[in-house]
């Protein structure tokens, strides 16, 4: 466990995370969090989704608050491997991820991918059924495809974008990619792959109580038929086929079956579906898209000012160290860090996006 200097010059204990799960949403992250909590080498954050680097938490809390969530019960953070799982991190922009890499350059990244149609539909079930308490069977096709079209949902399914942003920032060796199908069909192999990547002891057997646990089973939460309406299935395939083709190129054919299946589904079309697609994309979804973009422009400005506040909070006069960069950071390194954090320059810190 690392140490750093407080603003008074005293050494204080730090428990920064050594790994983070970045999604994707609806890909078994709750199940993985519960399983990893049982491993003797690992200290998970005391709540599953910290979301610190995304928006609200970072705006209202500092790094001391964040790191405190990784402390052991005795306050010493004795377990060598610490992490959090926040699937929403997969939607972060490149400039945000680059800044995380400045803070935590040795972070190990876990990413789980699920068939895009299954993932998008699972999210629809969650949002309409579990969160809104509606019977999805009674939700209109228009409402369902509008939900698919939402910017945040499309970002969660654009796996190539996520992979490129995070591997550019941390280097491709830092990123562990696996599939929801393996989690579902062979949990031991899936979990041990994660453990090896983050440096935990292997082999390790998944506790028996988790082998029969459905992964956030939305059918039990909502109580409805989970069959995807044909028009919704076609709409998702039409919307996500090109991003999935780009993903397949990046992964050198590892998701060819997804591409083939989505091409078949997309080919089964009719005029009314195509009309619905155009109306949704050019009319119905426009207000939400504009509102989303405007909100995030404002959020970026607030985050920028938040980092300025963190700088003032942790930097003392003269050559005192800055907590963000550890015990031997100087005021010069502080300025270098902050200026680098503000810049939104493209390009990898190390490595490239080849997988």
Where are these regions (language model features)?
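The conserved 3'-phosphoadenosine-5'-phosphosulfate
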Residues: 164-281
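PAPS-dependent sulfotransferase catalytic domain
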Residues: 20, 35-43, 50, 93-209
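Short clusters of hydrophobic/aromatic residues that line enzyme substrate/ligand-binding pockets
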Residues: 53, 159, 255-258
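Soluble or luminal CAZymes and related metallo-dependent hydrolases
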Residues: 58-65, 88-96, 154-162, 186, ...
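PAPS-dependent sulfotransferase catalytic core
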Residues: 1-89, 103, 107, 117-142, ...
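Short hydrophobic helices that act as membrane-entry/anchoring signals
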Residues: 277-307
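Short glycine/proline-rich turn/loop motifs
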Residues: 11-14, 141-148, 222-231
